[in-house]
Curated annotation (Swiss-Prot):
Natural source organism: Invertebrate iridescent virus 6
The UniProt record lists the keyword Aminoacyl-tRNA synthetase: no
Protein name: Putative transcription factor 282R
Job description of the protein: Transcription activation.
InterPro entries associated with the record: Poxvirus_VLTF3, VLTF-3_Zn_ribbon
Keyword vocabulary terms for this entry: Activator, Transcription, Transcription regulation
Protein family (similarity comment): Belongs to the IIV-6 282R family.
Length: 383
């Protein structure tokens, strides 16, 4: 819970120091952005390089926009700070106030001070990132019923805000790792803990089965036609495909398969993110199939073996990497990729939404190799 008696002068100083440290990076951000914009002008860039550059560009643009927040923050908080100073500098005869029949003067000042603190915090929250809010201890809640929601979720990839939520399971939108938040409370008996753990094990299996279906584009889902239209518009705007009214050299309409020939699943995922369709990240392969006509892999013959392997792998994971307060599970798509390789199935690692950085890849490799070794399975590192 947020402390309503917090010293907002000290807090204001910390916030301004944060902004000033970011402003010092302004020139570096601008130089990097200019470099990326020049690289994006190069023709025939590989799709993955093109998408990585676009993501870096969006990140830097957001950083530069955030730098302008200092002036806006100062304008919005200046009056609040002034009122706060007036309150804390108000002279008060404590002895007289306490011995009088109407000690309302103290109460009124305390109330005004707390109201001013809350007003300041509300403004500050609108300008600060969630990690900074947490570091300043401004992420509290005001009700016991929200206790579970107040527990921060941080994925091992560093993501702390972009998740799909399925009951108490949080699925990272950046790397698909799964986290379950368990409230560590003495009111939960041992039987309840067992039930929660069993439910989590069951849910992990359901998510893995869903992942198998999604890899084959077999999930039952309803995708609004508008999403396809907007994706096509983005692909045209970024010169990845020709406009729908473009003709070939003989004056004939260009076929759908030819128009979308170079469109990859990475393109689809990137533009789903850009358009804000987070709920459809898991439908990337199905959407790609619908747009391009390129059939996804069929792994029905391996499904039973994959599910059996997954049971063994998760059991071993819980034994070796158990966490009392929060249970994390490695990226489900990465697990599917490695289990397919275990069975000699030739699959493309780029078709799996995994491992955004070398550090993340190394972490997953270490965990998976440990699990495979414990189970007597041959592990193959991903290059």
């Amino acid at each position: 819970m947020i402390n309503e008696d917090i010293d907002i002068l000290s807090l204001d100083n910390k916030i301004k120091l944060h902004f000033e440290s970011e402003i010092q990076k302004y020139k570096r951000y601008n130089e990097r952005l200019l470099c990326i914009e020049n690289l994006l002008k190069i023709e025939n860039l590989r799709p993955k390089i093109f998408l990585d550059l676009l993501m870096d560009k969006k990140y830097l643009e957001k950083k530069l926009v955030n730098l302008s927040n200092l002036d806006l923050y100062s304008i919005e908080t200046s009056d609040i700070i002034h009122r706060y100073l007036t309150i804390i500098n108000t002279p008060l005869n404590i002895e007289v106030a306490l011995t009088s029949q109407k000690p309302t003067e103290i109460n009124n000042l305390v109330l005004k001070r707390r109201e001013t603190v809350q007003e300041f915090i509300k403004v500050a929250k609108s300008y600060l990132t969630e990690p900074l809010l947490k570091s300043l201890q401004l992420m509290g809640n005001f009700g016991k019923e929200d206790l579970l929601n107040s527990i921060p979720v941080v994925c091992t990839c560093g993501n702390d805000k972009d998740f799909y939520k399925d009951d108490d399971i949080y699925i990272c939108q950046l790397c698909n790792a799964e986290t379950v938040k368990l409230l560590n409370s003495s009111s939960v008996n041992d039987g309840g803990r067992i039930n929660v753990c069993n439910k989590y094990t069951y849910d992990r299996k359901v998510h893995f089965k869903d992942c198998i279906n999604q890899y084959q584009g077999k999930q039952n889902t309803n995708i609004n036609p508008r999403i396809y239209d907007e994706l096509e518009e983005q692909l045209v705007n970024h010169q990845i495909i020709e406009p729908a009214n473009k003709k070939d050299k003989f004056g004939n309409p260009i076929s759908q398969s030819k128009r979308f020939k170079i469109v990859t699943r990475a393109h689809i995922l990137f533009f789903l993110k850009e358009l804000g369709y987070t709920k459809h990240y898991e439908d990337t392969i199905l959407i790609h199939y619908t747009l391009t006509g390129k059939r996804p892999d069929n792994i029905e013959h391996l499904e039973e073996k994959l599910m059996a392997d997954f049971d063994k792998l998760t059991e071993q994971y819980d034994l070796l990497f158990k966490d009392i307060e929060r249970k994390n599970f490695i990226n489900t798509q990465y697990v599917l990729f490695q289990l397919l390789r275990k069975h000699g199935y030739n699959c493309n690692k780029d078709d799996f939404a995994v491992l955004k950085t070398t550090e993340r890849k190394a972490c997953h490799d270490d965990i998976c190799k440990t699990l495979f070794d414990a189970l007597g399975w041959k592990y193959m590192f991903v290059m």
